[in-house]
Amino acid sequence: MNSGIDLQGTFIKSLMDLGIPPGTAKAIWMPLPMILMLIGATVGVLVCVWLERKISAAAQQRIGPEYIGPLGLLAPVADGLKLVFKEDIVPAQADPWLFTLGPILVVLPVFLSYLIVPFGQNIVITNIGTGIFLWIALSSIQPIGLLMAGYSSNNKYSLLGGLRAAAQSISYEIPLALSVLAIVMMSNSLSTVDIVNQQSGYGILGWNIWRQPLGFLIFWIAALAECERLPFDLPEAEEELVAGYQTEYSGMKFALFYLSSYVNLVLSALLVAVLYLGGWDFPIPINVLANLVGVSEANPVLQVVSAALGITMTLVKAYFLVFIAILLRWTVPRVRIDQLLDLGWKFLLPVGLVNLLLTAALKLAFPVAFGG
């Protein structure tokens, strides 16, 4: 399979062609993935927050943000600036080290996970062969930060929120991993680029959502629970726990939790688009479109347009899923903590195992359709 163009290798090779020594070229590259991640994730979050406020307003028959910039587009920026300039208070009885480390451990793995997301055709920051495994490993760090934040606050509501968050995250990580494992089994690779390539060539009919409808539902439900979105926002249920593990946080530390929540939502939507909806792939194969227009596939202009539209396609799919997640907030009531854990352990986990066994059986029976 075509592994795509690795941005790291291409960038370093381009600098070496200009006469820059390999060591210097690698040193120049080192901060760039972090900068790209920060810029991309921040812009994604700003769009996500604006969408949430506008869609929530529409659901409640309000106008929503309107006066801060055109259509209220700068309202999320104003929110961010407000949080940055707020006083950062550490409670007198809190553990200052753990209190500070908690938000960092929550937000850092989410940003690092963007490294393995292919945003468009041949556009991935680091194309490593074990991208999915790296994402699962990074996501398992988050519960530690949540529990640390709740425990270090020395507040009963924060502690209960932290315990709930850790229990919820651990409960839904396993079904999430099982649904991803079925995709890995079909594509014979842990690389996100290979998974998208495995779906390409047949347009919308080749997308994994048709071969893995059960896995798609498990992944989406588990992803919403991991992001603590309604109806799974038990760790910070305002009516029960004030603000959960975030109760004692203010200023920039609170902003990190706020940022992490939305970055995680956009990341989950991007991963669903990559794993189940063909990533950058068009609903109609690009070669069919080229033949209809009468343009050769080797045409460099077509390749550039195809790459640009591929990025757009990935983002459209991802933000459609973000729209669904926001809509669910205003249409589904919050579940109880016992119902939430029962759903994870007694329903999603067994169904995930059955889905994995079915995928293995179908792969043996129909190797062409299921990646044998």
Swiss-Prot record:
Q: Name one GO molecular function term.
A: NADH dehydrogenase activity
Q: Does the keyword Thylakoid apply?
A: yes
- GO cellular component labels: plasma membrane-derived thylakoid membrane
Q: How does it sit in the membrane?
A: Multi-pass membrane protein
Q: Main localisation, per the record? A: membrane
Entry's localization field: Cellular thylakoid membrane
EC class: translocase
The record's Gene Ontology biological-process terms are:
aerobic respiration; photosynthesis, light reaction
Matching entries from Pfam families are given as: NADHdh
* Catalytically driven reaction(s): a plastoquinone + NADH + (n+1) H(+)(in) = a plastoquinol + NAD(+) + n H(+)(out); a plastoquinone + NADPH + (n+1) H(+)(in) = a plastoquinol + NADP(+) + n H(+)(out)
Protein family (similarity comment): Belongs to the complex I subunit 1 family.
Q: What does this protein do?
A: NDH-1 shuttles electrons from an unknown electron donor, via FMN and iron-sulfur (Fe-S) centers, to quinones in the respiratory and/or the photosynthetic chain. The immediate electron acceptor for the enzyme in this species is believed to be plastoquinone. Couples the redox reaction to proton translocation, and thus conserves the redox energy in a proton gradient.
Q: Which HAMAP family match?
A: NDH1_NuoH
> What PANTHER family is this protein classified in?
NADH DEHYDROGENASE SUBUNIT 1, NADH-UBIQUINONE OXIDOREDUCTASE CHAIN 1
Q: What is this protein called?
A: NAD(P)H-quinone oxidoreductase subunit 1
Give the species this sequence originates from.
Trichormus variabilis (strain ATCC 29413 / PCC 7937) (Anabaena variabilis)
Q: What is the lineage of its organism?
A: Bacteria, Bacillati, Cyanobacteriota, Cyanophyceae, Nostocales
